[in-house]
């Protein structure tokens, strides 16, 4: 999925911002969260997040649900590199495995399982 954030901000600017964030808040992860383009789910009001590294993927999903005011019976799926990350995984481990070369972690969300492949949970 193509990131609008990447389209709107040049690489050097994104990289410098991510580095500044990581220096100032070493226990936080810079995340860009965007809606999958053709999804019928609500658009989020804020793309940029500074996430505690010990937050789980499931807790991050909860934050996103609240931001888009998604009712409990509606489904939401989040994707990292077009794959569903395990809900119990720590955001720090997802960041280390999937961060972009600019230093941000790009997450997309959808009301449907667009890509449909789950990451294997490491035991």
From Swiss-Prot:
It is found in: Cytoplasmic vesicle, Autophagosome membrane; Vacuole membrane. SUPFAM superfamilies: Ubiquitin-like. Residues 117-123 form a propeptide. GO terms for biological process: autophagosome assembly; autophagosome maturation; cellular response to nitrogen starvation; mitophagy; protein transport. Keywords: Autophagy, Cytoplasmic vesicle, Lipoprotein, Membrane, Protein transport, Transport, Ubl conjugation pathway, Vacuole. It is a lipid-anchor. A lipid is attached at residue 116 (Phosphatidylethanolamine amidated glycine). CDD domains: Ubl_ATG8. Its main location: membrane. The keyword Transport applies. Pfam families: ATG8 (PF02991). One of its GO terms (molecular function) is phosphatidylethanolamine binding. The record marks 116-117 as: Cleavage. The keyword Transport applies. The C-terminal 7 residues are removed by atg4 to expose Gly-116 at the C-terminus. The c-terminal Gly is then amidated with phosphatidylethanolamine by an activating system similar to that for ubiquitin. GO terms for cellular component: autophagosome membrane; cytoplasmic vesicle; fungal-type vacuole membrane. Ubiquitin-like modifier involved in autophagosome formation. With atg4, mediates the delivery of the autophagosomes to the vacuole via the microtubule cytoskeleton. Required for selective autophagic degradation of the nucleus (nucleophagy) as well as for mitophagy which contributes to regulate mitochondrial quantity and quality by eliminating the mitochondria to a basal level to fulfill cellular energy requirements and preventing excess ROS production. Participates also in membrane fusion events that take place in the early secretory pathway. Belongs to the ATG8 family. This is Autophagy-related protein 8. It comes from Sclerotinia sclerotiorum (strain ATCC 18683 / 1980 / Ss-1). The gene is atg8.
């Amino acid at each position: 999925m193509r990131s609008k954030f990447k389209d709107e901000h040049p690489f050097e600017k994104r990289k410098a911002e991510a580095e500044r964030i990581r220096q100032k808040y070493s226990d936080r992860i810079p995340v860009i969260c965007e809606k999958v383009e053709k999804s019928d789910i609500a658009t989020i009001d804020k793309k940029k997040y500074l996430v505690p590294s010990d937050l789980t993927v499931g807790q991050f999903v909860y934050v996103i649900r609240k931001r888009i005011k998604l009712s409990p019976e509606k489904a939401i799926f989040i994707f990292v590199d077009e794959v569903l990350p395990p809900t119990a995984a720590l955001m720090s481990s997802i960041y280390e495995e999937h961060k972009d070369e600019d230093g941000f972690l790009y997450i997309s969300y959808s009301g449907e399982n667009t890509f449909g492949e789950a990451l294997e949970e490491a035991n």
